[in-house]
Amino acid sequence: MRLCWLLLIVPISALAQIVPEDYTLVGVAVRTRPAYDGSESQVTDLIPVLRYYGKPWFARTTQGVLEGGARWALTPGLDAGVQLAYEEGRKTSESSLLQSLNLPNVDPGVSIGAHLEWDSNLGQVPVSLLGRVRQNIDPDRGAQADLRLNAGVYGSGRMIVAAYAQATWANSKSIESYYAINNADGGLLFTSIGLLGSYDFSRHWSAVAGVQCRWLHGDAASSPIVERTSSYYANAGIAYRF
């Protein structure tokens, strides 16, 4: 997956301070994704684009999942919060392998959890570090924990680009329910790197895009439904900014 690393290369001279703004973003994007992480089948769907930060309420898709809840400042640059998140399922109809194995769907669900987020600057580069735990409200679906680092890598006029790296851990129930295996050990589920970008083509309208490469680990990677251990996601859309 050498291409995945090349996606993170940007001109060093382009590094610029990106001053965060208090704004709301609402839109929609077209996404290409694997039928499930580990599938060779690639499918296309529509996803929301959302960024809203109030006091204390928030809703966003900018940290890897669709989530919303409340958050509070502990100290300048450090926030803690609780959230509900949409957890994607797995459709048998999207994969010929799942159909041949006659496996049932894994329905989408909702998780409840908490997070801690730190925002700062390293020199001219804005960075944020997110730690988050998510427990599915269906106890059989288990729990996951995320650690995500974001860094602004380009900011010039109307265009902003950020890079990120994420690691997600899962307990045994989460791995067993999604990857159709028994007696799984909990542990590192996947790691990923990606880019997010936006371009303002008017005062209120922005084009948004993202690309992500993801690698499975542990018992999930050796599941009988896993055809490949690497996957990619990409999306492009439009959003209204106010």
Where in this protein do the model-derived segments appear?
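Solvent-exposed loop/turn segments connecting transmembrane beta-strands
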Residues: 35-43, 59-62, 74-75, 106-109, ...
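Outer-membrane beta-barrel transmembrane domain signature
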Residues: 56, 118-120, 134-221, 225-227, ...
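Outer-membrane beta-barrel "beta-signal"
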Residues: 47-51, 149, 229-242
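Transmembrane beta-barrel strands of outer-membrane/channel proteins
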Residues: 26-32, 61-63, 82-86, 129-135, ...
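Short glycine/proline- and aromatic-enriched beta-strand/turn motifs that initiate or cap beta-hairpins
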Residues: 17-65
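N-terminal signal peptide c-region/cleavage motif recognized by signal peptidases
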Residues: 9-14
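Internal, conserved structured core segments that host functional sites
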Residues: 100-139
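Outer-envelope beta-barrel architecture signal
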Residues: 18-26, 44-46, 57, 74-80, ...
